[in-house]
Amino acid sequence: MRVMLGITGASGAPYATRILRALSDHGADVGVCASAAGRQVIALEIYGDRGMDGGDALERFVADHGSPDTRIWAERDYSAPYASGSSRTDAVIVCPCSMASIGTIVAGAEANLIHRAAGVQLKERRKLVVVPRETPLSSIHLENLLRLRNAGADVIAAMPAFYHLPQTIDDLVAFVAGRVLDSIGVDVTLHERWGESQVGAP
């Protein structure tokens, strides 16, 4: 399974961490691309260091949570397979997805490889999952999310549930990550599902 994980400048890097780890454990062929703002978010939210070089943060992030085969793609490296519809990509996940990136994708514009890959998935009618993390939402945000959904994307907002009685922040992260993985057909259980009493190992 070929998957691209795009990381933009919205808060929510821990979700990307859990998704990358699960995909790697599942044996997926994963490529990671982070925008400049996304790299800064990783440095702050994963490593707690605002001054950390974004490139170093991304490399450490992939080394810590990916597999040895996980590849980092530069923000504007359009030689990546995800940049063309002729190279079949099973899923593109943009997590976290900023509202600026949502607007760019909806407009059919391309400021980086993440936007290009998302556009390719839409035109080829393949799986695109975006995980927005913003509040409150303006009418522009809501309209853009609706347009993106109508274009074929799965919109999985970073809204964790509480019916599984989470005990830690990681439990909340796992709920959202699990819904993303469900959306692309990866059969792992990161959280207790409704009606189930036990959680299987990821």
Regions found by a protein language model. Give the residues of each.
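A cross-family phosphate/adenosyl-ligand binding-site feature
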Residues: 1-128, 136-202
